[in-house]
């Protein structure tokens, strides 16, 4: 028997799925990804999807215009429920963007190669989600044209923002998050923009991509500065994954409202944000790989890893639900106990049971490898989880406000047509921006995939 032959009773070692499909070269990777932008026709599916999302964006514009004309009374908010769909949607959209930052920055610093195929469109998802989230604080105030009052700028009247207000904290957190994410995304695009510039046949495309590439020539000096800047921004973006949704959670945690005033909110909100963010990445990645034949670049390894991250963060979210109830009863605070009972037996209990089904029970299927490797089931589960995370925000915001300290101040919340139209409009805006992004810029990082080709070929030779 050869010394290199394994013993007969040795357990079979399961090989991981590749991060990149076999047989690819530098040229084939570039051709496949760049062709989606430069040469592939739009197709009836893209045109139909864009038309639908554009229609929803028009619904959003009409909803905001009617809001400005008539005021926030067109929504279902009232006294005491002054925070309705606007804040629910704001928190939900901000959370969705977190997976893009985690994939781009934290996994980059941890040298996780499987991020390479998904980081570009995950970063774009972050920017589009932040854009959708930014709409709601503005229109929630009822006077969006007065939004500049929230910025600290020198004025002759000497008016300064109230820095003890969580609304001001949100302005700084979200604007910082959006700025760093935009810089991180754009710097990563520079080598690919130069590739598109050099391969474009259309003069207009050459001018646009040439201007955006900012003179990139691929010299050693360019690559050195690019890698230094990318590493620096990854280091800056990493704490933002924790800080942004922590600040958003302070909107609730610093208040004395029962159900909000709890210390579990910061880690609970961060875990929930990553949870919903990875669900949205799966929601985008699965149709994208199917529509453009990118199965060799977004492989089962990527889907399996994202499902595992969803399972892990879902367990943290479930722990947060448990701690909420435990602390309510352990503290003996009768207001917190009553609110916990209202979530189980009150007028909005069906929303609470729905979120438990979506966020805790359904994701337990991800323990099974067959489920994680079933693409259609993963897609459905990602939609279910995103729905559950929206319901979680609704339960936190609305139920806590409907049952306050004084029974005479209790109320009911009934969303109106304009609440739903604004939500659907932002979903349309998000999807429309994704449709434009996929056809205007490379959805997968060409330069990083080229590096992966070299690394995969070296590892193949080492195994042989």
Regions found by a protein language model. Name each.
Residues 1-46, 147-162, 192-228, 301, ...:
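Extramembrane terminal tails and long inter-domain/linker segments of multi-pass membrane proteins
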Residues 2-24, 64-75, 80-83, 90-221, ...:
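Transmembrane-helix bundle segments that line or gate the permeation/cavity pathway
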Residues 35-40, 44-64, 155-354, 451, ...:
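Long, contiguous internal "core" modules enriched in hydrophobic/ aromatic residues
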Residues 60-66, 134-144, 320-327, 389-399:
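C-terminal TM-helix exit segments that contain a strictly Trp-centered aromatic cap at the helix terminus
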Residues 91-98, 163-182, 273, 349-360, ...:
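Hydrophobic alpha-helical transmembrane segments
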Residues 99-111, 177-194, 280-290, 360-376, ...:
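Transmembrane alpha-helical segments in integral membrane proteins
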Residues 257-261, 333, 371-372, 397-417:
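Extracellular/periplasmic helix-loop-helix junctions in multi-pass membrane proteins
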Residues 377-387:
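Central hydrophobic cores of alpha-helical transmembrane segments
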